Amino acid sequence: MGKIAFVFSGQGDQYPGMGKELSEKYPVAASVYAMCDGIRPGTSAQCFEGTVEELKETKNTQPCLFATELAATSVLKDKGVLPDAVAGFSLGEVVAATVCGIFDNETGFRLVCKRGELMQREAEKFDTSMAAVVKLTPEQVVEICERYSDVYPVNFNCPGQITVSGLSSQMTDFFSDVKAAG
């Protein structure tokens, strides 16, 4: 068999019911959710039964995605599938660091719980929004952002996708400019 890499996603891949079947079928996955519930009560319930709106709240998204990604990984490891490499994007970087042993499971989970709380708290201070811009070059996105006092490229995700964030009052016009640019 060739090399195996585990790649972990960031916020945005959450969905209601995530991990429920995994937890019901594999005791090792259920034990991950139990560990998470012991630290942050209700995490598994949010994963399994939470609404789209609840899971969009960063304070919930971060712990729920971490728990689900760690649970899935625990099943693979239990079946003898071990990674030769790990990688992650944003939140996924913390999962990757945990899976490869930089953090133990509890420390990794506590970290993302705190991270989610802090991100949520800061986001609530201002009326902001963010979105991924696709099909424009980085130069085009930066040029459009520079037209606004409070709109910024915040993450160059991959070729052809750039996350932009700013005050909601300016983002509507920003989106119009993006649409006009292509």
Give the label of every model feature segment.
Residues 18-21, 25, 50-51, 58, ...:
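Surface-exposed loop/turn and secondary-structure junction residues enriched for glycine/proline
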Residues 2-87, 164:
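Helix-rich "cap/lid" substructures immediately adjacent to catalytic or cofactor-binding pockets
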Residues 1-2, 82, 126, 158:
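Residue-level preference for short coil/turn positions at secondary-structure junctions
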Residues 11-12, 38-41, 100-182:
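Alpha/beta catalytic cores of group-transfer enzymes, especially the acyltransferase/condensing modules
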Residues 62-132:
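Gly/Ser-rich oxyanion-binding loop with an adjacent helix/lid
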Residues 9, 14-16, 21, 92, ...:
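Short, electropositive, low-hydrophobicity segments enriched in small/polar residues
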Residues 22, 36, 96, 144-145:
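Broad structural signal for hydrophobic residues in well-ordered alpha-helices, predominantly aliphatic
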